[in-house]
A protein has these predicted regions:
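Short, solvent-exposed positions on alpha-helices
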Residues: 68, 88, 110-114
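N-terminal alpha-helical interaction modules that lie
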Residues: 1-82, 125-172
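Residue signature of alpha-solenoid helical repeat architecture, marking inter-repeat boundaries
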Residues: 48, 88-90
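TPR/TPR-like (Sel1-like) alpha-helical repeat modules
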Residues: 107-128
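Generic structural signal for well-ordered, non-membrane alpha-helices
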Residues: 68-75, 95-98, 117-121
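Solvent-exposed loop and edge beta-strand segments that line ligand/cofactor-binding
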Residues: 83-87
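Structural register within alpha-helical repeat arrays
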Residues: 57, 92, 97-99
Length: 173
């Protein structure tokens, strides 16, 4: 899922990637993240649009290696997503993947594997509950491809820092 020229493309990347235990949370670049958070409505109506700038920015942050920051933005989008909606399930999976990626950076492969496994459960839930085509995040996202990638990662004997997942690139493969 590449980022089109839009508001999301104009949002700056944080000045640094926050990593728990390496930097104090007060040192996270909250000023930059606030710009994206301000784009998230209090509630999305029926679905989260696949092209919503905060969603795209959260995905781009993950793919650029800003895992903690990605999780923060995606959690804000998740909180505004319709209750019980399919987007909440996919967003939860993406949040767990960003968290797993962060754990890999922190050299905690077992925790990363657990988060990848939890994300896979969410993706399997989506696969069982197919819906009609639309303009929502779920309909535009290749969940089956992402699930296959997670299964391959989890089948490895051990995960390393190099095993992090760029879920935005899944749609472009």
């Amino acid at each position: 899922m590449s980022m089109p020229p839009s508001i999301a493309a104009k949002l700056p990347l944080p000045q640094w990637a926050y990593v728990p235990g390496e930097t104090a949370e007060a040192e996270a670049d909250h000023d930059t993240l606030w710009q994206a958070m301000a784009l998230v409505p209090s509630r999305f109506q029926d679905f989260v649009p696949a092209r919503h700038p905060a969603l795209r920015y959260g995905i781009a942050l993950n793919d650029a290696g800003y895992f903690w920051e990605s999780q923060e933005i995606l959690e804000a989008v998740w909180a505004a997503a319709p209750q019980g909606g399919r987007e909440r399930i996919l967003l939860r999976a993406c949040i767990q993947i960003a968290n797993a990626n962060l754990r890999l950076r922190m050299q905690k492969p077992r925790a990363a594997a657990r988060y990848f496994g939890e994300a896979l459960v969410e993706l399997d839930t989506l696969g069982r509950n197919a819906a009609a085509a639309g303009d929502g995040f779920v309909e535009a996202f290749p969940t089956a491809r992402l699930a296959a990638l997670l299964k391959a990662k989890l089948a490895q004997p051990a995960l390393t820092k190099a095993d992090w997942v760029e879920f935005g690139k899944i749609g472009r493969a």
